[in-house]
Amino acid sequence: RFLIGVPSFVVLAIMIIVPIAALRSLKWKKPFIIFGAILFVVSLVLLLLKKPKRYKDWIESCKKPPVVRLSKNGEVVKIDNVREFKWRSLDDYDAAWVTRSYYLDQLDSLDLVVEPLGDSKLFAHSMLSFGFGPERKVVISAEVRKEKGESFSLIAGLYKQFELIYQINSERDALTLRGTQEGTQLYIFPIKASQAFMKSLFISMTGKAGKLTDEPKFYHSLRANCTTELFDHIKKNYDGSISYGRGVLFPALSGKVLHEMGWMDTDLDYEEAMEKFRSGMRVRKFADHPDFSKKIRE
């Protein structure tokens, strides 16, 4: 499928173009150019024709995609395969898939969860946490749906190498999965939002989650990643003007953007807010606490 994280057609093109450059002075360079061009075009056509697949040998944590049903009155979202794993480490966990019904009139909070990638000040994984009461929060995260033995590559993600999934998890699952890794930082930013906006956003995102189960789509490192997918739903449901800015391009800056726009639900200044909403250590400390969602926000 790809070599060292780079799609085969790119590697093949390089392998052909380099010898051609060295043989430019030879009379028979033209056949090489023609052959290389044909091979490149064939590989490109095969890539364009490649379709995402629903059935593969998926890793356990994304084996069961969400099945979503909206009630006739539009007020209850029932979801099968909500993930509620108990994570001790990335490889040590108790698997649990449950069915949950979410009553939209109980929706009372929205948080943006940001996990900076390593020490990066620019790149991060972004998720949304919807609250239906103090300890009933559900996280929706657009992610790569990995096969067994597969690892993520930013370059490979540009060339139809991964399927996209909207993972729906309990907040404890989503945050402890990432918090099990010592040193991993997490930020939970409360967002100022009307219930009407939160409702339409939740319906939009869960609807897309269910649609991907039946109509799979490729993940794309630039156009269909964790942050661009969230932004598309926010823009679609927000009653106002919103532009594709640095918070989408560089999601590790999204906290700063939220604060500048007045969308962060706090009276603290930016530095104080970042310290207040830094939650990685609390996630690890209270992973098994019955009031997990409350404790990690204190």
Q: Predicted regions span which residues?
A:
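Glycine-rich catalytic cores of cysteine/serine-nucleophile enzymes that process amide/ester linkages
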Residues: 77, 88-186
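Activation targets extended, charge/polar-rich intrinsically disordered C-terminal tails
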Residues: 1-20, 206-298
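Alpha-helical transmembrane signal-anchor/signal-peptide segments
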Residues: 51-73
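Juxtamembrane helix-break-helix junctions at the cytosolic face
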Residues: 18-29
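A short, structured loop/turn motif at beta-sheet edges
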Residues: 70-75, 131-135, 195-198
